[in-house]
């Protein structure tokens, strides 16, 4: 199973995306901030990240750069 991390600060949208992906057969992890996204990324085997670029605690582009160096 492929695992997808959804980093989206809008709770309802985050839940809707995760629900839709789960129904399509993917494993999903939801995070509502860059910090919780980093935690989920390190804690789980993530194959794909769906990322909001405007997060309350950091810009999504910074998150992408962080992933690149992991």
What are these regions (language model features)?
Residues 1-70:
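N-terminal/domain-start alpha-helical segments
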């Amino acid at each position: 199973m492929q695992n997808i991390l959804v980093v989206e600060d809008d709770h309802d949208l985050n839940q809707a995306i995760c629900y839709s992906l789960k129904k399509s057969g993917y494993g999903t992890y939801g995070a509502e901030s860059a910090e919780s996204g980093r935690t989920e990324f390190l804690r789980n085997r993530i194959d794909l990240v769906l990322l909001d670029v405007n997060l309350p605690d950091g810009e999504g582009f910074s998150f992408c750069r962080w992933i690149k160096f992991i």
